[in-house]
């Protein structure tokens, strides 16, 4: 069977007719009022009995989240479909292009995806009550079409058995030192939303010339932002150029020899939004899951177990974890990522020859 590769531009082009004839509306609807989890919603969800959750979360946490939901709402099963954010984006485009409606709720690690899905008219408006009460408006769409579920950072990290603290890199510039040649690992922007945003922000702030120099360092290329922390924890490489900061924190807490570095130039940032699809085959179960996923209970699980940052104001960070406000961050720009995504992938592939 021939496999077709979809670019972001392909997604836009293939979806135009469908969006115009099926989903588009001549009038912009008012944002819905905030919705609580009601007995009626729970009962309707139980009648559907299931939902499909496409997510870029690491599999262990996605399954933990799904299991906790199933315990809270017996009779509603969650099927977790985990992949890299960019792969999820392509998969949904292929399914919708073939008039296949499978996904109920999506969580991505690339805000740019929601720009496309919203433009295509694929998302259902839904505003969970706790989002309206406890999330800053910057973390949810004004039309209530998507909500930032988690806030991700992509720092540098290293294996403490292989690198002494005093020798560890402190900046992206330090990674160009010849002593790190053949000792680093990096994720790929064509697979991971976190890495797509990290690559865009680093290229914007430091220039593509930085990556041209980095490529000469014989960097091991892997796919996911969740792969790079594993490589340094196992000692397969000494330094992580980018990747899931929360996994480095989790691995360190579990006793693995890893340490996080917040680079002097700034740490790349990526919001991880979730949305309910308008054509969801299980719309009530989808809304129940989306609502609960943004409750304080689920968001605290995100903080405590996944070690990720939450936009929910009532969550409490564990002692010893650096607060997001205390980290120098690069600026997220999903609009530019949406416009430049294909160019980023192409230029990256040319530089790293992958």
Q: Which residue ranges define each predicted feature?
A:
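Extracytoplasmic ligand-binding site segments that recognize negatively charged/polar headgroups
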Residues: 55-66, 78-96, 101-229, 233-236
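Extracellular/periplasmic bilobal clamshell ligand-binding domains
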Residues: 298, 317-354
């Amino acid at each position: 069977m021939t496999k077709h590769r979809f670019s972001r531009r392909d997604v836009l082009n293939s979806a135009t007719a469908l969006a115009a004839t099926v989903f588009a509306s001549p009038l912009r609807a008012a944002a819905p009022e905030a919705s609580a989890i009601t007995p009626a919603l729970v009962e309707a969800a139980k009648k559907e009995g299931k939902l499909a959750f496409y997510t870029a979360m690491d599999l262990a946490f996605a399954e933990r989240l799904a299991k906790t939901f199933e315990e809270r709402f017996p009779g509603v099963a969650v099927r977790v479909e985990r992949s890299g954010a960019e792969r999820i984006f392509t998969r949904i485009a292929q399914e919708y292009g073939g008039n296949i409606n499978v996904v109920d709720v999506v969580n991505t690690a690339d805000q740019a995806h929601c720009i496309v899905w919203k433009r295509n008219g694929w998302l259902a408006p839904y505003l969970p009550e706790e989002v309206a009460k406890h999330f800053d408006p910057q973390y949810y769409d004004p039309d209530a079409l998507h909500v930032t579920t988690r806030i991700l950072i992509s720092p540098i990290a290293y294996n403490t058995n292989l690198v002494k603290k005093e020798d560890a890199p402190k900046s992206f510039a330090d990674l160009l030192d010849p002593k790190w040649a053949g000792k680093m690992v990096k994720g790929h922007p064509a697979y991971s939303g976190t890495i797509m945003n990290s690559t865009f922000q680093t290229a914007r702030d430091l220039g593509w010339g930085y990556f041209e120099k980095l490529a000469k360092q014989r960097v091991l290329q892997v796919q996911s932002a969740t792969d790079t922390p594993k490589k340094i924890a196992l000692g397969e490489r000494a330094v992580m150029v980018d990747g899931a900061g929360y996994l480095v924190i989790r691995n360190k807490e579990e006793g693995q020899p890893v340490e996080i570095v917040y680079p002097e130039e700034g740490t790349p940032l990526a919001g991880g939004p979730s949305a309910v699809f308008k054509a969801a085959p299980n719309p009530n179960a989808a809304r129940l899951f989306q609502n609960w996923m943004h409750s304080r209970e689920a968001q605290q699980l995100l903080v405590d177990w996944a070690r990720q940052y939450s936009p929910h104001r009532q969550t409490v960070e564990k002692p010893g974890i650096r607060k997001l406000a205390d980290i120098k961050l690069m600026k997220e720009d999903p609009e530019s990522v949406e416009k430049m995504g294909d160019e980023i992938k192409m230029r990256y592939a040319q530089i790293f020859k992958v």
